[in-house]
């Protein structure tokens, strides 16, 4: 008996202490028909939320001091996103808290293991010299469907999709022709005539485009014309900003070809065939995939905090949780052409006659959509994430979308993020022309009184290079303070949207005491700190910012420690530690106070 009790204590670990409002969860020893006590825990976080919801509905006295969902170490794989609803709200005196037990490693994962690897492949699309070294596995199934993926992690490292030029390597294009929607490139050294899932990644100033290749025509002079699938082809050649540059001050824009079995020729690369779903992997010398932890993501969203305007969610805490292995699949379905910051075009084009009611010189219009996110919140107040980790994420990691207020992200770590690590605020998406100033009729629709502090963000925007570490759009009274940002392919900390000098909801924002380094690694027109539009009462102070990284394929030199992009106004900028003369300006307003 004593041995049994000791074993149970070891299993429970940091969850031994219990109070009336505690609900216990264990992936390994739990049962969703249990009582949720320390010795009879539930198995899923979803069931714990349901139990907490019932306590609140029935005004159970156990809620008086707060509900604490205490989660033991383990990997939790929700079959759909974990939904948190208005009925899960707490109060200031009785919050709802989802927390990993002290010292626990609680992983909320969208990943699925790839197993059953077989060595050797005689597929003639593979380069002959690597056929004996490539391993093949069937795609995992999720609820009876093949998992289609653009991401694969091998022993915790994101593997490279098969590419013509290798990791982060590109080649300069020769022509960009709007008339027939084509890009002319040097003829590839590999026969790609059977590569029906081939993609071209296009480097275009401050953003990228991912275009699915429809056809390649050899022009016979060392050049090849490439045509693309719809809808991305129309969008790529219609929108004016940003488009590729031909013969710029640092050369023409660059491209990479990816996602063909013919290109699988380097250790660490992989490819998924379609429609079979088979996954091909070329491991490093001496590695056996059957002895490795190889994971693909099977869902894009891990948690949705989903309030409404009429019934916002409130008083929730998330502590000591790890979110990992979320997917980003959209480019495989319809390509990916972005305006800025990872926001893809729904439509965009040059105006034949310039001018809109609010901006006489505007010569283009654009309608955009928000990137996917692993964890997102909308219509919520008094929400807090603390001591959480976000790793191996396909798109955005954590997004405070709409009408989120009085909420904090504190001491969280973001590592290996395909898109933006932290996003907050409206960005003029979902039918709202993106250059029109946003000033909501209902003030509470604006994201406000947010604080992002003491977070560490490394290796963000590693899949969509045009994303950022921290991106805040239409926000007010928001503090971004004491964060470290490193290794990001575009800008570090970005605040503002709209390219407008007009008043909107943006004001009283503070970017203070942050350390930003190793940014602008691939794209320029960037800043360690980057701002847009009029934001009265805002400050940028005491930040430490290194010089921009020398991006190898940028077509100009426009990258700065602090970049005041179009119509930035209302900021007081003082006491920042950076290279002298490292400000960039694009039509700043008259109310800027800048002290170098």
Regions found by a protein language model. Give the residues of each.
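Sec-dependent N-terminal signal peptides
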Residues: 4-14
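Boundary at the C-terminal end of the N-terminal hydrophobic targeting segment
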Residues: 18-21
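Extracellular polysaccharide-degrading/modifying enzymes targeting complex plant/algal/animal polysaccharides
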Residues: 24-379, 384, 430-441
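Short glycine/acidic-rich loop motifs that flank beta-strands on beta-rich extracellular proteins
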Residues: 58, 80-81, 300, 327-333, ...
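Residue-level recognition of the N-termini of beta-strands and the immediately preceding loop/turn
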Residues: 63-69, 94-96, 450, 467-468, ...
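Extracellular beta-strand solenoid repeats
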Residues: 70, 77, 83, 97-99, ...
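Predominantly extracellular beta-rich ligand-binding scaffolds that present long acidic/polar faces
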Residues: 79-86, 93, 97, 558, ...
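Right-handed parallel beta-helix
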Residues: 314-325, 361, 381-395, 404-419, ...
């Amino acid at each position: 008996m004593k041995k049994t009790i000791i074993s149970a204590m070891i299993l429970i670990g940091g969850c031994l202490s219990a109070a009336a409002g505690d609900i216990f969860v264990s992936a390994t020893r739990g049962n969703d028909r249990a009582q949720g006590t320390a010795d009879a825990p539930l198995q899923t976080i979803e069931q714990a939320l349901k139990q907490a919801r019932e306590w609140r509905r029935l005004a159970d006295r156990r809620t008086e001091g707060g509900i604490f969902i205490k989660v033991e170490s383990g990997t939790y794989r929700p079959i759909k996103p974990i939904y948190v609803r208005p009925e899960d709200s707490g109060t200031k005196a009785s919050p709802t808290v989802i927390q990993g037990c002290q010292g626990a490693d609680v992983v909320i994962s969208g990943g699925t293991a790839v197993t059953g690897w077989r060595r050797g492949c005689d597929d003639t699309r593979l380069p002959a010299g690597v056929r004996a070294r490539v391993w093949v596995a069937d795609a995992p199934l999720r609820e009876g469907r093949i998992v289609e993926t653009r991401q694969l992690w091998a022993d915790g490292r994101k593997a490279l999709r098969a590419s013509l030029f290798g990791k982060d390597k590109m080649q300069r294009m020769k022509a960009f022709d709007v008339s027939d929607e084509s890009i002319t490139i040097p003829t590839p050294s590999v026969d790609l005539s059977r590569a029906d899932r081939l993609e071209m990644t296009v480097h275009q100033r401050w953003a990228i485009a991912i275009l699915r290749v429809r056809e390649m025509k050899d022009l016979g002079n060392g050049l090849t014309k490439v045509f693309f699938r719809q809808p991305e082809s129309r969008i790529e050649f219609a929108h004016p900003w940003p488009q590729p540059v031909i013969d710029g001050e640092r050369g023409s824009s660059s491209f990479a070809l990816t996602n063909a079995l013919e290109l699988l020729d380097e250790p660490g690369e992989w490819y998924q065939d379609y429609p079979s779903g088979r996954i091909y992997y070329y491991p490093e010398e001496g590695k056996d995939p059957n002895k490795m932890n190889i994971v693909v993501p099977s869902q894009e969203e891990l948690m949705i905090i989903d309030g409404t305007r009429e019934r916002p969610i409130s008083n929730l805490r998330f502590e000591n949780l790890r979110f990992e292995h979320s997917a980003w699949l959209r480019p495989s379905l319809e390509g990916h052409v972005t305006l800025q910051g990872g926001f893809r075009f729904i439509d965009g084009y040059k105006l034949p006659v310039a001018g809109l009611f609010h901006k006489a010189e505007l010569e283009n219009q654009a309608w955009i959509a928000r990137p996917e996110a692993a964890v997102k919140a909308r219509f919520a107040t008094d929400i807090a994430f603390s001591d959480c980790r976000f790793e191996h994420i396909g798109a955005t990691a954590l997004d405070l979308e709409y009408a989120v207020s009085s909420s904090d992200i504190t001491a969280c770590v973001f590592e290996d993020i395909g898109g933006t690590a932290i996003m907050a605020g409206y960005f003029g998406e979902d039918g709202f022309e993106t250059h029109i100033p946003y000033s909501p009729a209902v003030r509470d629709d604006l994201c406000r009184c947010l604080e992002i502090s003491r977070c560490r963000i490394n290796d963000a925007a590693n899949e969509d290079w045009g994303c950022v570490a921290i991106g805040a759009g239409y926000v007010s009274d928001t503090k971004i303070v004491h964060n470290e940002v490193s290794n990001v392919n575009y800008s570090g900390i970005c605040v503002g949207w709209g390219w407008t000098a007009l008043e909107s909801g943006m004001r009283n924002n503070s970017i203070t005491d942050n350390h930003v380094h190793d940014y602008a690694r691939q794209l320029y027109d960037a800043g360690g700190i980057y701002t847009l539009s009029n934001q009265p009462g805002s400050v940028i102070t005491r930040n430490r910012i290194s010089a921009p990284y020398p991006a190898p394929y940028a077509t100009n030199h426009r990258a700065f420690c602090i970049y005041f992009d179009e119509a930035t106004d209302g900021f007081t900028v003082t006491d920042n530690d950076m290279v002298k003369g490292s400000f960039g300006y694009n039509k700043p307003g008259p109310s800027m106070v800048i002290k170098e």
